Amino acid sequence: MRKWIILLLLPVVSFVKNKEQQSWIRINQLGYTPDGVKVAVWCSKVQSGISSWQLVDVAAKKVMFTGKVGNAFGAYGPFKQTFRLNFSSFKKPGRYYLQVGGAKSPEFEIGNDVYKGAADFCLRYMRQQRSGFNPYLKDSCHTHDGYVLYGEKAGIKDSTQIDVVGGWHDASDYLQYSATSANATYHLLMAYRDFPKVFTDEKKANGLDGKNGIADVKDEAKWGLNWLLKMHPKDNWMFNQLGDDRDHMGMRIPKEDSFYGKGFERPVYFVSGALQQRGKFMNNTTGTSSTAAKFASAFALGKELFKKDKEFSELLDQKATTALQYAYIKKGVSQTASVRSPYIYAEDNWVDDLELAETAVGNLFKSAAINDPASRSSTAELYQNAFEFAKQEPITPWIGADTAKHYQWYPFINLGHYELARQLKDKRRDTVIGYYKQGIQKVWKKAQTNAFYRGVPFIWCSNNLTTSFAIQCYWYKTLTGDKTFSELEQANFDWLFGCNPWGTSMVYGLPSWGDTPVDPHSAFTHLKNYPIDGGLVDGPVYGSIYKGLIGIQLKDADEYAEFQSDVAVYHDDYGDYSSNEPTMDGTASLIYLLAAKEAESKGGFSYSHGGIIRGDSTQKKIALVFTGHEFAEGGNFIANTLQQQKINASFFFTGDFYYDAKKEKLINQLAKAGHFLGNHSQDHLLYCDWNKRDSLLVGKQPFLNDLLGLSERLGHISDELNDPPSLSKSSYYFLPPYEWYNDSIAAWCKEYGKQLINYTPGTLSHADYTTIKDKNYRSSEIIYQSIINYEQNNPAGLNGFLLLMHIGSGPDRTDKFYNRLPGLIKYLKAKGYQFQTVAGLLSLN
């Protein structure tokens, strides 16, 4: 009987096997933006082809788009055939999935907000990694750190106690490294500098719930800076790491460690520039530069971003200088130390660190040069030093290579190239940007041969490399406007969130609905089932690396077994520390990348006190705005310039201006030419106190009289000129007198159907009325350079700018800025900007 049962079951078993899934569609589980690159990857275990595929609306269950496949990419890893499915031309927001035959992708969203909050989400992991007071545990740990080793050259006896409590634990172990901490701090500072609107304020400085008026990312960066200050307490004292691999003797929730033979103290290793222990051997330390230069860079950028905290800012300024000096004690690398095993951060490059440090410190001198011309020569010298270092390592050595040692080339990309290119104005800028392009081309040469566009090597922490390379592509695009590598950039980003052979996100808990790590190599999850939200895991490694590592043993069955190959191995398993351990510095880099992605996709307006102060910062469009009250001597010149350049601008005048018979001809000329004429108030009143902005100087009714008093006059002008399009929204937008208002004024505008706007801050264009007798006087050259500098030094340039100037400045100012208008317009045109009226710019939303 048993034989018959077996025989009867055989066809069923055979049928089930034939129906096992043979093909998959990999997507970015976070989703895609309407105007962004959108590519999925179809991959199959059988050698077969496909000709077309469909994009299906989840709610309507309707095929919305049918695409034809391009060239087959062939075998990759565990797959015998792969194709790229490009649906970038489909832009309608919604929830969709892709299907090809029997293969169906996970559902995903297309929308402008798909990346919203992702950067802030990853900050959760950074807070959870805090040493000292840990806000996640609501408890303190490692409060006895530490005792000094290798400090004899600086006159520090071995085992001398020093306070270095704080900072971040490096990964799932609790070691702390100056190099990774300084790099993480710099990335967080950059993220806030470049994308301040992305981040929210939901936590206090200690990481607990509550607002403190400071963006959470800035709080986190300051946590890093405070620890770095402890690690460089004196001009001739600097420390490289806290703890060593004796930490690996047991997994535990961070509290106090007694592994080191001195109670609960942990060793803190001095930056000596000399060889230090590496297990049974010695490391290859050659100098002080790599670590000290990272300190200098973080301190310098921190100084710029914490100017309002004068005492802290001045301390960072001082430490940036001493850290840079420390970097030159002995040129070379400072590798980390270990006691029990040979695993260390064996960094081999340092010129990239000095390039960034010289640039960052140069920026401090540049800021000082505004009031101290003597600093200009120092700035130029520092930038030239940085350029010389850039030439020594034009391309980060792992880029284009098949392998590298663990953290051999660190940071994983050259941040100095980006920061230096933002400052240079001559041919050196093109040279430095060219280095980025050469590196990207090296990766592209490998990536274009496979459907995942994978050109990053599968070495330890490959996800960190992937994140950094995507940032390099983004920076190249930002610096040049060249989108040649946008699809490669997006492919690396997509890889991190599911468009990879395993179909999984590499970030714990992101997205919340997706396939993400659940069993990382972490004590928090393994011992207590605590989530480690936002942590970026190390990522896949070559099969050969995985097989050669010490102490790896999976604790559960491998759910990704059918997707493993010699090309790459990844496990969501606590036992695999090579591919599934999150790292603090990798997560900090990802925070920058996610912030960039969110900023790119926002496409919204910027507001201040209820007023719009900037249009869409992702669009290369700008509005020239001229205000007028008493003077108008520049009117004819401005009008003629705009006519010659064939562009339109916006003019906001007061009642005194509009009712002045002497100005009637100019007003009509501007309106007939298609320029926007707007409301700058009836009587040019000051609405609120200069020093106490919340204090109103007018009541609601006097304000409304000032706001609405011009409606009749603007209506008459419109009637007289047969309602030209330029006046169709003239009474809707209101630019307040003195460009000064508060939330109450903006709310009253909204109540009466008006939208308050103001100029975009960042340049000195609005200072073109000042006279040489004024304390705040700015010459036309200084004003012009402030505009050019802002355009060149900020990732979004002047995108969406409301660039405000005055139609006249009166007889006391002889240096008329409007005379620079032709040159300014030509410059902006050459940069690719499109000129729009205020109505045109702000109707884009």
Regions found by a protein language model. Give the residues of each.
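Aromatic (Trp/Tyr) and acidic
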Residues: 29-101, 106, 112, 127-183, ...
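Structural recognition of the beta-strand scaffold that forms the well-ordered cores
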Residues: 185-192, 228-230, 239, 355-356, ...
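Acidic, glycine-anchored loop motifs typical of Ca2+
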Residues: 206-214
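Active-site beta->alpha N-cap acidic-glycine motif
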Residues: 604-694, 709, 713-732, 827, ...
